[in-house]
Structures are given as structure tokens and as C-alpha cells.
């Protein structure tokens, strides 16, 4: 059996690769195990808030990511007919952060940037096509059994960072529950070539409608946009596809016909609000979607996952390199779980509820709230600065109080 005096990271998505990068830069030996043959080509998450941009800068990645990303100086709230409710301007935070903007880039491109940086670290190895089958641990090591095209193998390491997604095998194998709810609605993520800017759309838009609610964001610099909307969960994938021209005629500004846009990708999926009972059990520590899952309204899922990766790597470095107590990992677990339960999940839930609100009186109140935030820059600043809570213990309390 192979023994690693370091950390095994299970999951080769952006959260796992970021964790490996920070650990590797600290001189720790890391093996990343990923079931897929390479970086997933799916764009999936696309939005990165100011606290996340700051973290990416601390990882040494921001410059490379900015070269590929769409810079988003503002975002808009709209009615289903495209009418503007309010626009939020990130520049209102220019005195609070060096990163007064949102970045838009598919997580596959972010992962590829991280991967290129990892190739410079000889102490980090990525093993693609390695699927975790079993996890066991004792006081000194955690042992992972994997299957790959070459057969079954076993690897033991001092620590395991589980970043293997919402269906985490590691989380299941160590017996942690994943409590919460699955939303009734089925989300449909489509990537489409259509020029929303011709219709006055911002690069990021949240559409408020009881039926035709949606998120519309620019994915890259080629003219590709993400349109994410809701469908009845009882519909088959084929039925979702058949309904697409009808839905797009209502969802897209200008009521286009199919010959006026090109769909590059369509993915129906279910969304959840779930959280692991704890983020640490023995020598296994969870981060990202393996630890918590949220609906994508507001772009808080991967934004939080990036900060998980940074905090987890820092905790492991403190324990492994600096002789800190393993309670440091408990502190990580408690803090990041608190961030999700007290900020990320309630905020994403409120965003989702607002977008599909059907009560006319509540819709009027919601509109008034966002219009105030969109016209009063002091209110806008307070509204946007709240995202600093993604940082957990790093929240700049004096800024929040001064807002």
C-alpha cells in the first residue's frame, strides 16, 4: 500500500484544485484523485463576487483569470418582460475593496487556469480516472481505496480533503448526513449565442416573474450567454427540449424565433439547500459542494467554495507545517458551516424566492426595496458589502457597521 506523508484531495473541480494549489505552494505533498478523465468541460458556476476575486488574487490566479473572464461592473434586476427594476453598481464598493466588480467565467476555464499553475508544482500529483470506492481511518492515517483503468489500489495519507461534489462519495463513506431540502422546481441551464446587449441587458441579470423567472449572464467574450430558468420537475429531458423555443420566445428580449439564436448546451437539473452535519470527521475534512449545496441564485455556491478551499488549506498548513493543534480544523469546520447556514443558504433562498414570487402585493414590496437600493448609493453599498460575510472570520466588521 502506498503511503503519502501529506494530503489526499478527492475531487478535481475548482475547489479541490485550489486546495491542492495552496497546499502545494506551502511545500506539502498532495495527491488529487478525480474520477473523470480530465477537467470537466461543463461551465456550471460562472459568477465570482468581490470577496472571491480577492481570494483568487491571494491564490496568485486573478491576473490569469481576468484575462479570460468577462468583467461585470454592474448587474440588473428585471421584470419578465425585460423592464428594468434596478441596477446595482459594483463601483459603490471602490473605497471598501480593491475588487469592486464581479467576474464571469465558466468554472471549467477557472479549473484550467488552476491546473496550469499546479503543473509547476512537483509535489502535487493529479490522478485522473481514479474513483474512490472506500474510505477508512485510524488515529494516524486515512486510507482510500480507488478503482481506475489500471485496477484497484489503496493509498493512505495523513489527511483527506473531500471536495468531490454534492454527491460526495467520501461524505457518504464516513457516515455524514447531508440534511436539507430539494426544491420542487427543476432548473434548466442553457448556454446560448444571442446578443442580449442589443436589448440593453447588463452582463448579469436577475429576472423577476412568477413563471418566466431567469438568470441571464454573459459567459465569455465570444457572445455566449447563460440563461437559467425553471421547469416543472415532472417533465422529461425530451419535453424540456421540445418546450425550449416556446420558453425562449418569452424569456429572451425581442421574442426571437429559433433561427435567431443558437443553443450550445442545455442541462436540466435539480437544486438543493443542504449541509453536512459537520465538515470534519477525524482525518477527513469537507469543502465546497461536498460540504454544502445551494441553489445558484446569486452566484454564492462556488464563491463560497473558493473561500472554503482557502480556509481549509490554511488550516491544514497550520497543522502540518506549523504544529498547530488539530482543533484548528474544527474551527474551520465550525466557521465555514456557520457561513453557509447563516449567510449563504438564507441569502440564496431569499434570492430564489424573490425571483419566482407570485403574490402581487409582495412583488410590489420587493420592487420598491430593489428600486431604493438601486437609487440610494448608501443603501446599495450596504446591500453589496453584505457579501463580505462569505469570508466568515475574515469579515471586516467595521466596514459592515459603517455601511
From Swiss-Prot:
Keywords: Aromatic hydrocarbons catabolism, FAD, Flavoprotein, Monooxygenase, NADP, Oxidoreductase. Disruption phenotype: Cells lacking this gene are not able to grow on 4-NP. The keyword Flavoprotein applies. InterPro entries: FAD-bd, FAD/NAD-bd_sf, PheA/TfdB_FAD_monoxygenase. Pfam families: FAD_binding_3. Its EC number is 1.14.13.167. GO terms for molecular function: 3-(3-hydroxyphenyl)propionate hydroxylase activity; 4-nitrophenol 4-monooxygenase activity; FAD binding; monooxygenase activity. FAD binds at residues 6-35, 279-289. Pathway: Xenobiotic degradation; 4-nitrophenol degradation. Its cofactor is FAD. The keyword Phosphoprotein does not apply. Gene3D superfamilies: 3.30.70.2450, FAD/NAD(P)-binding domain. It comes from the Bacteria. One of its GO terms (biological process) is 3-(3-hydroxy)phenylpropionate catabolic process. It is an enzyme of class 1 (oxidoreductase). It catalyses: 4-nitrophenol + NADPH + O2 + H(+) = 1,4-benzoquinone + nitrite + NADP(+) + H2O. Belongs to the PheA/TfdB FAD monooxygenase family. Involved in the degradation of para-nitrophenol (4-NP). Catalyzes oxidation of 4-nitrophenol (4-NP) at position 4 with concomitant removal of the nitro group as nitrite and production of para-benzoquinone. Monomer. This is Para-nitrophenol 4-monooxygenase. It comes from Pseudomonas sp. (strain WBC-3).
Amino acid at each position: 500500500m502506498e503511503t503519502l506523508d501529506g494530503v489526499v484531495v478527492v475531487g478535481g473541480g475548482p475547489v479541490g484544485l485550489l486546495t491542492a494549489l495552496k497546499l502545494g505552494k506551502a511545500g506539502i505533498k498532495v495527491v488529487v484523485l478525480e474520477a473523470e478523465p480530465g477537467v470537466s468541460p461543463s461551465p456550471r458556476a460562472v459568477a465570482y463576487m468581490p470577496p472571491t476575486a480577492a481570494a483568487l488574487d491571494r491564490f496568485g490566479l486573478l491576473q490569469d483569470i481576468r484575462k479570460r473572464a468577462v468583467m461585470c461592473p454592474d448587474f440588473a434586476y428585471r421584470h419578465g418582460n425585460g423592464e428594468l427594476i434596478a441596477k446595482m453598481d459594483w463601483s459603490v464598493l471602490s473605497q471598501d475593496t480593491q475588487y469592486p466588480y464581479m467576474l464571469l467565467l465558466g468554472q471549467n476555464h477557472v479549473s484550467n487556469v488552476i491546473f496550469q499553475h499546479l503543473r509547476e508544482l512537483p509535489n502535487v500529483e493529479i490522478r485522473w480516472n481514479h474513483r474512490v470506492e472506500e474510505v477508512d481511518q485510524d488515529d494516524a492515517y486515512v486510507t482510500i481505496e480507488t478503482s481506475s483503468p489500471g485496477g484497484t489500489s489503496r493509498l493512505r495519507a495523513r489527511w483527506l480533503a473531500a471536495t468531490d461534489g454534492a454527491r460526495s462519495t467520501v461524505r457518504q463513506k464516513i457516515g455524514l448526513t447531508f440534511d436539507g431540502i430539494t426544491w420542487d422546481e427543476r432548473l434548466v441551464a442553457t448556454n446560448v449565442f444571442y446578443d442580449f446587449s442589443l436589448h440593453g441587458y447588463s452582463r448579469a441579470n436577475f429576472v423577476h416573474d412568477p413563471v418566466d423567472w431567469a438568470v441571464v449572464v454573459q459567459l465569455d467574450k465570444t457572445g455566449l450567454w447563460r440563461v437559467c430558468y425553471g421547469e416543472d420537475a415532472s417533465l422529461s429531458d425530451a419535453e424540456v427540449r421540445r418546450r425550449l423555443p416556446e420558453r425562449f420566445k418569452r424569456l429572451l428580449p425581442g421574442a426571437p424565433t429559433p433561427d435567431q439564436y443558437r443553443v450550445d448546451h442545455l442541462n436540466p437539473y435539480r437544486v438543493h439547500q443542504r449541509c453536512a452535519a459537520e465538515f470534519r470527521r477525524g482525518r477527513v475534512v469537507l469543502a465546497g459542494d461536498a460540504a454544502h449545496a445551494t441553489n445558484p441564485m446569486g452566484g454564492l455556491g462556488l464563491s463560497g467554495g473558493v473561500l472554503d478551499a482557502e480556509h481549509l488549506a490554511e488550516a491544514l498548513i497550520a497543522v502540518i507545517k506549523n504544529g498547530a493543534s488539530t482543533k484548528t480544523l474544527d474551527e474551520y469546520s465550525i466557521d465555514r458551516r456557520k457561513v453557509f447556514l447563516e449567510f449563504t443558504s438564507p441569502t440564496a433562498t431569499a434570492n430564489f424566492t424573490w425571483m419566482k414570487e407570485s403574490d402581487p402585493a409582495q412583488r410590489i414590496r420587493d420592487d420598491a426595496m430593489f428600486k431604493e437600493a438601486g437609487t440610494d448609493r448608501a443603501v446599495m453599498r450596504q446591500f453589496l458589502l453584505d457579501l463580505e460575510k462569505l469570508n466568515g472570520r475574515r469579515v471586516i466588521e467595521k466596514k459592515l457597521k459603517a455601511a
